[in-house]
Amino acid sequence: NDTLVSDTANFGNLPWREVFTDPQLQSLIETGLKQNTDLLSAAQNVKAAEASLMSARLAYAPSLGLSPQGTISSFDKNAATKTYSLPVTDSWQVDLFGQLLNSKRNAQVTLKQMKAYRQAVQTQVVSNIANMYYTLMMLDRQLEITKATAEILKKNAETMEAMKDAAMYSINSAGVEQSKAAYAQVLASIPDIEQSIRETENALSTLLGEAPHAIKRGELEAQVLPTELSAGVPIQLLS
């Protein structure tokens, strides 16, 4: 599994550690590269393909065989003479139809495909972890702003109602009810945001190969990303 972590490469021309500099995010990516089930499965497929290629190469080597032989002879009623030999024989499979060569080529193609697949899975794991991590920070910020907005609207509704009761500035009931409705609408959105946070944390935990749990994270304002990044996530994010 260590090779999966050390086998990291570029986001465009940048190592992912330079792209994602948040220590918490780096730790999550390392965990994902070690424990993600899809990635571990892809690594096993690469090992199986390597073993298949080795087997195809060994098919070119001669097979060795031991053929122990023995004889017993007796002349003129003398004591029997025992003779033993242990010859080593070798044989080569005659590849009349190129079967060995085709087998080797197929194994090479399979190995390349499995390595490409593993690299694609690694790329997807890193990008998904980063995406969910930043989503969590954006949801945190959204929750913070929503709570602050709800508090402002609550005070505004209370102030307008007090002014109406005191018959100040021609505040009518419709204006008060409108301010209360705005407060209630914003307040009702808070549980939805909190639910989105929990669902995103659970999804990220699953991606990391762990049971659902709270995810430690930084703040959105503290994130620093390169100013120029090409669109999309290139396959060589990990190589």
Task: Please state what every model-predicted region is.
Residues 109, 116-235:
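Periplasmic alpha-helical coiled-coil/stalk elements that build and connect Gram-negative outer-membrane
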